[in-house]
């Protein structure tokens, strides 16, 4: 039996997000939907899975009852095993934690469609910046993309300020991307706040790029890390064959469930290697 996986987000003011939590949790449990939904005053961010497309269709129909969450665009992929073991609906101060107080993320960069992305990042005058964490980037990235070497998203502002110190006067063209689009959207707003004017981000992130282009120009190198038990997907959105970093043997679905922050070890090696 296969599973349908949906990833989505929306920046929107949800003043009553505390009240939304139990309602969403109950609906998902009743419809056998598992995954993680994050709610904040800034909006919603989620990856959920079900064994039937109809269950997810009902979920999005349920969201449509709230005008603020109506017609949310989502990315769909598939997995042979359910990538989640339970349903979580979390409350957060920030939807994605950049760690900047009183930061307005509404003035963000311009979207670039997956179809136009390759042309943009192939230009010699464009800086392509990966806004994900290093352990994610280790699985794969766009060719020649800058790796900020961050351990978590909260590290990004410090790197960006340092990187901008000798470049903001040049006002270069900046292209940013992440897994599903939410982090690069917020990152472009931060770069604009630093003084850059020509800032762009990949609409729908890497997942939408894979779906729309199948990496036809081979500018993506490797796989894409996912925050679930699949660990990573290839450019066809199929769960990747992830190998143990110690013995180079593909890990099993059960072993994948124990992987933390992209550190891939099979059960045998985990007993002998100190993380």
From Swiss-Prot:
Source superkingdom: Bacteria
Catalytic activity entry: uridine(34) in tRNA + AH2 + O2 = 5-hydroxyuridine(34) in tRNA + A + H2O
Residues annotated as the enzyme's active site: 178 (cysteine persulfide intermediate)
Function: Catalyzes oxygen-dependent 5-hydroxyuridine (ho5U) modification at position 34 in tRNAs.
One annotated GO biological process: tRNA modification
Gene3D superfamilies, per database record: 3.30.70.100, Rhodanese-like domain (3.40.250.10)
Keyword Cytoplasm: no
Gene name of the encoded protein: trhO
Family according to the record: Belongs to the TrhO family.
Occurrences of domain Rhodanese (ranges): 122-218
Keyword terms, alphabetized: Oxidoreductase, tRNA processing
Pfam families with a match to the protein in the record: Rhodanese (PF00581), UPF0176_N (PF17773)
Enzyme Commission identifier(s): 1.14.-.-
Organism: Ehrlichia chaffeensis (strain ATCC CRL-10679 / Arkansas)
Phylogenetic classification of the source organism: Bacteria, Pseudomonadati, Pseudomonadota, Alphaproteobacteria, Rickettsiales
GO molecular function ontology, one term from the record: oxidoreductase activity, acting on paired donors, with incorporation or reduction of molecular oxygen
Protein name: tRNA uridine(34) hydroxylase
Keyword tRNA processing: yes
